[in-house]
Amino acid sequence: MEEGEKRLKQEDCNEDKIGTGILTLTNRRLAFDKTQSRIMDFSKRFGDTVVDVPLNDVSKVWKEGRLIKKVCFTNKTKESEQTYKFGVFNTKDWLKNIENAIEENRNQ
């Protein structure tokens, strides 16, 4: 993390296209680190950071699903838009925290 960056929320979750990993919300960005785990000894290793989106680049945040609930966001890049869907435990809380972090980041 960069200087002045604070971790607001972090959770082990699954992204629809990328797979399992850890979703992290800071006061500046959303990041998703891929993980690898082994069942034999219950170990888990961090892999590469595959999603690293500044909060200024997040154009839309929403939640979806009835049985399998997901928190989703769309990232604007110069070329296109990318949508990510994360299966987290408490989608309502994640949605509120992401929206608040985006608002606070814009007000700085």
What are these regions (language model features)?
Residues M1-R28, D33-T35, R45-V50, G65, ...:
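Anionic N-terminal interaction surfaces
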Residues S37-F42, D57-T74:
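Short acidic, Gly/Pro-enriched loop/turn segments at secondary-structure junctions
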